[in-house]
Regions:
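Non-catalytic, topology-defining segments of multipass membrane proteins
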Residues: 1-73, 144-193
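Transmembrane alpha-helical segments that form the membrane-embedded catalytic/substrate-channel core
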Residues: 6-18, 72-101, 106-110
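A generic hydrophobic-helix recognition signal that picks specific residues
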Residues: 38, 56, 83, 123, ...
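Short hydrophobic/aromatic segments of transmembrane alpha-helices and their interfaces
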Residues: 50, 76-77, 129
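Extended interaction regions within the primary functional domain
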Residues: 68, 79, 110-112, 116, ...
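Cytosolic juxtamembrane regulatory segments of multi-pass membrane proteins
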Residues: 104-123
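C-terminal, well-structured subdomains that either form a transmembrane helix-short loop-helix hairpin
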Residues: 122-156
Length: 193
């Protein structure tokens, strides 16, 4: 999940929402996208292939060990970090899942957990982890307003605002053990193990 999960999610939609046919973020005709987005995906795919060609060229010119050391290993670390943060923000036993009939934007935006990763990481990541609820409500808001927005969101949401200061390794363990699936029946469902 932490190293190859993100690339496999993009490539074959592993662990993603079920779609008819071949679900891939690289397939411009996939049900993930609207018809008017086909050319956007094609242009993006060209960029991905150009990047892969550049990596192949660098591997040929500099050697595969150099590319492994300076590109692939850091890439896997970034994937690990991205998936860890995203998983912990969106997967918690206290968060309900709303089915299509009862879901709305406000409920969906509130279905995330602000987590404290400590002063240094919060600062280096522009508080995306401890102000993530604000990001869901105002995704285009500059990061330097996120802490102020979070203070107001806490007041507005009251008991529906979710913050967890559990140490990250323990939060990961708890979510991994208790958040295995959601029931197939019901409009509002919670994680089960």
């Amino acid at each position: 999940m932490f190293t190859f999960g993100w690339p496999l999610y993009l490539l074959i939609n592993i662990s993603g929402q079920k779609y008819p046919g071949w679900a891939s973020h690289y397939n411009p005709w996939c049900a993930i996208y609207e018809k008017h987005q086909v050319w956007d995906v094609i242009v993006s795919d060209i960029g991905v292939f150009a990047t892969l060609a550049g990596i192949g060229f660098a591997s040929h010119m500099l050697g595969p060990i150099t590319v492994l050391k300076y590109y692939f290993i850091p890439y896997l670390f970034v994937n690990f970090w991205l998936v860890l943060i995203t998983y912990l923000q969106h997967t918690d036993p206290i968060l309900p899942h709303y089915r299509e009939g009862v879901w709305n934007f406000q409920r969906g935006a509130a279905l995330t957990v602000d987590r404290d990763f400590g002063f240094l990481i919060n600062h280096l990541h522009h508080h995306i982890s401890d102000t993530h609820v604000a990001h869901h409500f105002f995704s285009t808001m500059p990061h330097y307003h996120a802490q102020e927005a979070t203070r107001h969101i806490k007041k507005a949401l009251g008991k529906h605002y979710h913050f967890d200061d559990t140490p990250i390794p323990l939060a990961l363990w708890r979510s991994w053990k208790t958040c295995r699936f959601v029931e197939d029946e019901g409009d509002v469902v919670f994680w089960k193990n």
